Every structure is written in structure tokens, then in C-alpha cells.
UniProtKB/Swiss-Prot annotation:
Composition-biased stretches (Basic and acidic residues): 189-201
Principal subcellular localisation of the protein: nucleus
Biased composition (Polar residues): 202-218, 249-260
UniProt GO BP: negative regulation of DNA-templated transcription
GO cellular component annotations of the record: nucleus
Gene: WRKY42
Organism: Arabidopsis thaliana (Mouse-ear cress)
Protein name: WRKY transcription factor 42
Keyword Transcription annotated: yes
Residue ranges, annotated region (Disordered): 1-20, 180-260, 506-528
Length: 528
């Protein structure tokens, strides 16, 4: 703010002294705007006189309420200085004002920027959290999708397996595989090709179909078989009257001689079908859940049996498609360390060398069991005290036993203890493997005693008991041999003694056996 002094006297202010200037300067006090008319007239006259006298100077009379005190005074000069405020941008005060405004703007801008930064930081944190949630949700979805695919695939596999098993069961019930009745269980491949007119179903069960089927079997060497499921197998063990149903159906056809003959044919077919289901049971001590017999198995069922708290597991051979061999595995109720394995059926594929021990053992035992089916139940091989069974398997009664109580003939090989009085390593017919606990049969003794031949199949690279080209002749020879043994006690005793001497290799018994054989031969010559 600048002060500009103004002089109303018209003279130069430089000539005035400071004392004169202070004396001449008059201060305007209060102005009486409500004075009387006389005072106004007097003041106006005085002013006119002053103007007339000094036209070049301006005199201002100081007014006061007390006019008398100021009459003798006259002031020539009045300080009417003006305090002007300029709007120059270059002034100090304007610069201060401008600085304050700029600082306020900067502070406001900084505050806004800080708020924006905070908002952006919060938005980025929310974005990161949403990304994590999205990633976790995606991972959960992928895992659930994989689990769903696995469950669906597992269900499809179970459905496929169930469908395959049902189809196999239906196929086995409808098809009639080619075989020779009452012969050895074949280890070689068998033919599954059957003409449509020779196929039949088990559920029909009508007498004409049974008659037609039995006649086709007798003429074309075919027999009726049916693959058993775990339920039907367990029912078969509990129901000993399963086979006589065929006899009941055959009784409807009675009336004349031809119908009686056909009923006999039906009965014979049922008996042969029953003998076809011969089982070989092996008892061995093992801590493993299953014996290592060299084959590959798949478990398809398990159930509890009466009288045994241990479950019975059912297995099927998976080394070839459609292999009918099955086995049942169950722990002994009296001794849990004994594992009972029951084999049924014959392999239709080549066997590896590791599987030949058990396959040969079970095949020979089943062959011995089936070879005696032409004899009666009283004198046949179904009797545990049969001479032929004791001769072929020269073991103790606990080592090899034959059961006739089950609906299907079963022979049991007990490997839990060695036979009494015989050295297993010196027995040429049955050798017990110390390493695997399996039974190895001497394949050069049993077939010749049973009137059969042993063939070696080089194409399939395994040896087994195969069907001869003339099965009926072999069956007739076996029938003739067994009939001769049953009809001639002396010859039976001589044959038993001879076989015993050959197996044991005893020189002392060999002389006695020769005498007995000579006596038997002379008796036979005399009868002839």
C-alpha cells in the first residue's frame, strides 16, 4: 500500500518547514450537518469572502461543535492523503496471495491423488483375491470332473463285466461243447462249434428237448453242460437232488419199450453230465490267500458257507478268453492254516511250465475219478474204499479221498501231511514238491494203468492228457478192465499186489507178487 500526500494550498510543499507543516495541517473533526440556518449563512459568507480574497488558494475551515473554540483558528492545509491498493501482480502482497492459492491447489491435488492410490490399491487387492478364488474354484471343478469321469468309467467297467458274465453264462447254457462222455478231463483245446439244431437251453427242461438232445449226444458224441455261478454252485452243494430232476422228467415218457429206452438214455446223459463236473480238492498249508499254481485268476464272487466262518471265494481262469476252469478257495474251519482249493473244468489253452504241476495233478485225479463212472455206485470209484483208487494213488486214506455225498464227484488231495510208510520222493506216481507244496504225477504210469495213451503236443508246448482218436474203444477197454477187476477177486488182488510192488520197488514183495500173478494167470487159463 502506497501513501500519496496531497497539498491543497497550491504552494510548493518543499518551502514549508516541518513545524509550519504541522501548524498548517488541520484535522477534520466532526461535521455538524444539523446546524442552524444562521450558522450556515455566516459560514457561507465567510467562504465567499475567502474565495474572493484568495482565488488561487483553497481554504477549508474546520468545523466543530464548539465553534467558538475554533473561530480564532484557521487552517490553510488539510491532509487528504489517499491510501491506494494496487492490483499489480508483481507486488509482494499479490505474490503472497498467489502462493497461498497454489499451495492449496497442490494440497488438494495431493489429497485426491492419495485417495486415488488407496482406491487403486484396494481394487488390486480385491482383484488378487478374486483371482485366487477363481483359481481354487477351477481346481475344484477339474478335480470333481476327474472324479466323475473315474466313477463313470468304473461303472461302465462294472456294467461291461456284468454284461460279459451274463453273456458268458447264457452262452454256456445254450451251447453244447463237443466232448466224449466219461473220459479224461482234457487239457488241450476243445471245439466250441455246435450246429444250431444241436443247441438247447437248460430252462426249457421239456421231455422232447431232453430226448432230442440225448439222442444227438449219443450219435454225435456231445453232452449237455452248464456253467455254474456262485449261487448255483452253492445251491448244488446243498441240494443233492439236483440231478434226479432229469429222472423225474424222464418218468413222464414211460409207457412202452421205446420210451423206456429213451428214459434210460436221458438218465445216462444226466449221469454223464454229472460226472463231467468232477472236482478235485487240494488241501495245503499256506498263509497266502491263494495257492500259486502258475495260472492267472480273476475273482468273480464270494459268499459265506454254512458251518464255516471263513468266506468262500470263486475264481475264473483269465489266461484265455472263454476258459471254463474255475476254482473255489476257502480256509478250513478246524485249522485256519489249511487252505482248501477246489478245481473244476479243463483248460482250453496252452499252459506255462509253472502251471503244469497242479494241472497234471488235478487232471490225473479227475481222470481217475471219471474213469470209474461206468461201474455201479456200490463197486465203482465213488466208494472211498475202492481197490482201483487205492492202487492208483498208493497213499493213506487221508492223502487222497473220494466223496460221494456231494452232487458232483469230488476227490480230495491232502498235502498237509506226508503218507504213512511211503517216502514221497521215491513214489513214481505222486511226487510232492518241497518248494511249492504241489503234487506232481508221473505221467508215464497213470495213463497206461487206465488204458489210455499220453500224447505230447508240440504245437501248444505243454503235455497233458488228450482224447484218443477212438474214444469209444478206449472207454470199452477201461470198462472191460474194471469189469474184470470187479468180477474176479483173485485177479484184482494180484493186480493190486503187482502195482504195489512196482511202485514201492521192494525186492521182498516182488517174489510174492510174481507167485500171486502166476496163480492168477493159471486160474484165468483154467476158466477159459
Amino acid at each position: 500500500m502506497f501513501r500519496f500526500p496531497v497539498s491543497l494550498g497550491g504552494g510548493p510543499r518543499e518551502n514549508l518547514k516541518p513545524s509550519d507543516e504541522q501548524h498548517q495541517r488541520a484535522v477534520v473533526n466532526e461535521v455538524d450537518f444539523f446546524r442552524s440556518a444562521e450558522k450556515r449563512d455566516r459560514v457561507s459568507r465567510e467562504e465567499q469572502n475567502i474565495i474572493a480574497d484568495e482565488t488561487h488558494r483553497v481554504h477549508v475551515k474546520r468545523e466543530n461543535s464548539r465553534v467558538d473554540d475554533h473561530d480564532d483558528r484557521s487552517t490553510d492545509h488539510i491532509n487528504i492523503g489517499l491510501n491506494l491498493l494496487t492490483a499489480n501482480t508483481g507486488s509482494d502482497e499479490s505474490m503472497v496471495d498467489d502462493g497461498l492459492s497454489v499451495d492449496m491447489e497442490e494440497k488438494r491435488t495431493k489429497c485426491e491423488n492419495a485417495q486415488l492410490r488407496e482406491e487403486l490399491k484396494k481394487a488390486s487387492e480385491d482383484n488378487q483375491r478374486l483371482k485366487q478364488m477363481l483359481s481354487q474354484t477351477t481346481n475344484n471343478f477339474n478335480s470333481l470332473q476327474m472324479q466323475l469321469v473315474a466313477v463313470m468309467r468304473q461303472q461302465e467297467d462294472h456294467h461291461h463285466l456284468a454284461t460279459t458274465e451274463n453273456n458268458d453264462n447264457v452262452k454256456n447254457r445254450h451251447e453244447v461243447p463237443e466232448m466224449v462222455p466219461r473220459q479224461f478231463i482234457d487239457l488241450g483245446p476243445h471245439s466250441d462249434e455246435v450246429s444250431s439244431e444241436e443247441r438247447t437251453t437248460v430252462r426249457s427242461g421239456s421231455p422232447p428237448s431232453l430226448l432230442e438232445k440225448s439222442s444227438s449226444r449219443q450219435n454225435g458224441k456231445r453232452v449237455l453242460v452248464r456253467e455254474e455261478s456262485p449261487e448255483t454252485e452253492s445251491n448244488g452243494w446243498r441240494n443233492p437232488n439236483k440231478v434226479p430232476k432229469h429222472h423225474a422228467s424222464s418218468s413222464i415218457c414211460g409207457g412202452n419199450g421205446s420210451e423206456n429206452a429213451s428214459s434210460k438214455v436221458i438218465e445216462q446223459a444226466a449221469a454223464e453230465a454229472t460226472m463231467r463236473k468232477a472236482r478235485v480238492s487240494v488241501r495245503a498249508r499256506s498263509e497266502a490267500p491263494m495257492l500259486s499254481d502258475g495260472c492267472q485268476w480273476r475273482k468273480y464272487g464270494q459268499k459265506m458257507a454254512k458251518g464255516n466262518p471263513c468266506p468262500r471265494a470263486y475264481y475264473r481262469c483269465t489266461m484265455a478268453v472263454g476258459c471254463p476252469v474255475r476254482k473255489q478257495v476257502q480256509r478250513c474251519a478246524e485249522d485256519r492254516t489249511i487252505l482248501i482249493t477246489t478245481y473244476e473244468g479243463n483248460h482250453n489253452h496252452p499252459l506255462p511250465p509253472a502251471a503244469m504241476n497242479m494241472a497234471s495233478t488235478t487232471t490225473a485225479a479227475a481222470s481217475m475219478l471219471l474213469s470209474g463212472s461206468t461201474m455201479s455206485n456200490q463197486d465203482g470209484l465213488m466208494n472211498p474204499t475202492n481197490l482201483l483208487a487205492r492202487t492208483i494213488l498208493p497213499c493213506s486214506s487221508s492223502m487222497a479221498t473220494i466223496s460221494a455225498s456231494a452232487p458232483f464227484p469230488t476227490i480230495t488231495l491232502d498235502l498237509t501231511e506226508s503218507p504213512n510208510g511211503n517216502n514221497p520222493t521215491n513214489n513214481p506216481l505222486m511226487q510232492f514238491s518241497q518248494r511249492s507244496g504241489l503234487v506232481e504225477l508221473n505221467q508215464s504210469v497213470l495213463p497206461h494203468m487206465m488204458g489210455q495213451a499220453l500224447y505230447y503236443n508240440q504245437q501248444s508246448k505243454f503235455s497233458g492228457l488228450h482224447m484218443p482218436s477212438q474214444p469209444l474203444n478206449a472207454g470199452e477197454s477201461v470198462s472191460a478192465a474194471t469189469a474184470a477187476i470187479a468180477s474176479n477177486p483173485n485177479f484184482a488182488a494180484a493186480l493190486a499186489a503187482a502195482i504195489t510192488s512196482i511202485i514201492n520197488g521192494s525186492n521182498n514183495q516182488q517174489n510174492g507178487n510174481n507167485n500171486n500173478s502166476n496163480v492168477t494167470t493159471s486160474n484165468v487159463d483154467n476158466r477159459q
